[in-house]
Regions:
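Strongly charged
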Residues: 1-58, 65-141
Length: 141
């Protein structure tokens, strides 16, 4: 695939921590990001293989279902270059005198991805500053 620059805008933000806490400073913020639909992604994968788009979709969807089943049983799943899928949940704090009840105090069980640093670190990219988009007003002129 052709390499496009990562677009960004420069915005002013009040820094809330660190040596610049309380100061208004300029930072770069990613911009111009598009979302690639799953079907288009599968079309691109299919073009490089002997599989059809439907077969690629089916394999990816089935792999995620199987991985979710393993994680639901408390296992960690090595998901290749993407990283590791691990079980996670949120827990409410309970006082020392109160009995911990998992049905009440544990909530939102989920699959968490621990991304592979080598895969998710972008190398060889270049950047292009773009003008900040202005919000359109609905007031007549």
């Amino acid at each position: 695939m052709a390499s496009k620059p990562l677009q960004y805008v420069v915005v002013e933000r009040k820094i809330t921590f660190g040596k610049h806490a309380g100061k208004i400073m300029k930072i770069a913020q990613p911009s111009g990001r598009g979302r690639i639909p799953f079907r288009r992604f599968c079309d691109e994968v299919a073009r490089s293989t002997s599989f059809t788009r439907q077969e690629v979709e089916a394999v990816i969807n089935y792999a995620t279902e199987i991985a979710k089943d393993f994680v639901s049983n408390g296992d960690m799943v090595d998901f290749g270059d993407l990283g590791t899928l691990v079980p996670s949940f949120k827990s409410r704090a309970v006082g020392q005198e109160e009995k911990f009840n998992p049905n009440i105090h544990i909530e939102k069980p989920m699959v968490h991805l621990r991304p592979s640093k080598s895969y998710f670190t972008l190398t060889g990219v270049h950047f292009k500053q773009v003008p900040k988009k202005t919000k359109k007003s609905n007031q007549p002129s």
